Amino acid sequence: MAAVSLRLGDLVWGKLGRYPPWPGKIVNPPKDLKKPRGKKCFFVKFFGTEDHAWIKVEQLKPYHAHKEEMIKINKGKRFQQAVDAVEEFLRRAKGKDQTSSHNSSDDKNRRNSSEERSRPNSGDEKRKLSLSEGKVKKNMGEGKKRVSSGSSERGSKSPLKRAQEQSPRKRGRPPKDEKDLTIPESSTVKGMMAGPMAAFKWQPTASEPVKDADPHFHHFLLSQTEKPAVCYQAITKKLKICEEETGSTSIQAADSTAVNGSITPTDKKIGFLGLGLMGSGIVSNLLKMGHTVTVWNRTAEKCDLFIQEGARLGRTPAEVVSTCDITFACVSDPKAAKDLVLGPSGVLQGIRPGKCYVDMSTVDADTVTELAQVIVSRGGRFLEAPVSGNQQLSNDGMLVILAAGDRGLYEDCSSCFQAMGKTSFFLGEVGNAAKMMLIVNMVQGSFMATIAEGLTLAQVTGQSQQTLLDILNQGQLASIFLDQKCQNILQGNFKPDFYLKYIQKDLRLAIALGDAVNHPTPMAAAANEVYKRAKALDQSDNDMSAVYRAYIH
């Protein structure tokens, strides 16, 4: 295939990872953003998603030449919105060109009329005028506006100077209609975090900093800037403000349902231990976003699917840790987490100075603190990062990540957290994330038990369960969680999205957390008893919504 010449400002179709070709525009990267080594590539701003990425030239195609082809093979609402955004951009550009041409014509007519009125009568003066105009045009070059020489001799400014002031804008200066496609300079980083939950909207102008930007973009800049310390100081200042106001730092990840051009995968080798309901979705998204991943699972057969998708196989946890830079683990409970680290061929045997371990399991604070101590004692770096969500959210890359421990490691995990979740919170020292996660799941588990209790009460009092759900969905309690769990119960579908045995485990640990600080948890304790009854009815491996069966038996 013949090589296609591309340049700054061209509209293109860009292919990123496994995502379909997406319409974008070649733009200038931020000032200090390093270009990846290797093959030639361009910095592309994608329409519709506001994402951006370095794209290899062989993954780019001219927009107009391949428009019909791409529209035929790609479908979906987001894709159509992106194409519509391109067409709107083209219409604005065309309209501006027509307006500019019309204005130029009007100016020319007005100047010609003025020249007719002030034109000298003598032949010598006409020749002087012609020579004078010729000099001006020669100095101004092609495309410059004609200016009357008669007025130039009388005015305070030379024709050339006035013509330069009236000339079109200089190349490189973005037109106002293209402001939403302009890449911010690194100097605008100071204004890039408007708040802990700032959404990623990239609409800079030439004179003001970016506002409401995704703080994950800071990590993208830091990973590729030649002067990360300068950028980091501005970012840290904003983060400190968030910490002072909320007690934590929140980082909003890019919308994982969009084309994640903003996710530049880390060049670090990633390991992942544990391919259960949550771990499987996490690994799948890491691979989709281009990370290099080595997997291990106690049941080796679960690794096969991911090997086919491009993952590497580790024979033991120790081998995975020793061959990877950052190793994540997601297992079921405190005992499994300890066995994984301290057991034969465990994580600890692979830890050397500089190796990083991120435990995503939901465990108690004492367990995670113990694990952190043994990892750090071997020269390793430790981060706890339990996740709030379920299997579907894991598959969709929309988990909420609660992290605590090594702040630098948290920053290093940025692209991984973007791939697997929609939001991440940094909560300070080790143990804080474990406590927060247990509290979150305590609330969720208690709420689920209350939902089941309400549905059964409606049934025994002769009320319609469906009507109860409809009423709840129209009120302040309306949520995806409420609707999904009620639908599970009404349909008798208890396929696990969050195992009942695990929510009961979290309730038990949350109650113990309350006991440790002498804080009463009567609601959680009551809910825990209902889940224990459901487990006795052989519902452990069903979804948490199967707690409903504890009320009807």
Curated annotation (Swiss-Prot):
Keywords: Chromosome, DNA-binding, Isopeptide bond, Nucleus, Phosphoprotein, Ubl conjugation. Pfam families: NAD_binding_11, NAD_binding_2, PWWP. Residues 8-66 form the PWWP domain. Changing residue 437 to K: Loss of tetramerization and protein stability. It is found in: Nucleus; Chromosome. Changing residue 217 to A: Abolished stimulation of KDM1B demethylase activity, reduced affinity for histone H3 of the dimer with KDM1B, but normal KDM1B-binding. NAD(+) binds at residues 271-285, 362, 505. There is a cross-link at residues 135, 176, 179, 201, 211, 227, 237, 240, 269, 302 (Glycyl lysine isopeptide (Lys-Gly) (interchain with G-Cter in SUMO2)). Homotetramere. Interacts with MAPK14. Interacts with KDM1B at nucleosomes; this interaction stimulates H3K4me1 and H3K4me2 demethylation. Binds to mononucleosomes. Interacts with GATA4; the interaction is required for a synergistic activation of GATA4 target genes transcription. This is Cytokine-like nuclear factor N-PAC. The gene is GLYR1.
